């Protein structure tokens, strides 16, 4: 799993990725599976 945001690489747990496909951290975040 790889997440790309304006702040750079943001690591997330696999279980969190499975629960939500789109993660919003206050900035534009794109989730690529």
Curated annotation (Swiss-Prot):
This protein's record includes keyword Transport: yes
Highest taxon of source: Eukaryota
Distribution of this protein across tissues and organs: Intestine.
Protein location: Cytoplasm
Keyword field contains Transport: yes
Keyword terms: Cytoplasm, Lipid-binding, Transport
A GO CC annotation given for this chain: cytoplasm
GO molecular function: lipid binding
Similarity comment: family membership: Belongs to the calycin superfamily. Fatty-acid binding protein (FABP) family.
Known role: FABPs are thought to play a role in the intracellular transport of long-chain fatty acids and their acyl-CoA esters.
Protein name according to UniProt: Fatty acid-binding protein, intestinal
Organism, as annotated: Rhamdia sapo
Classification lineage: Eukaryota, Metazoa, Chordata, Craniata, Vertebrata
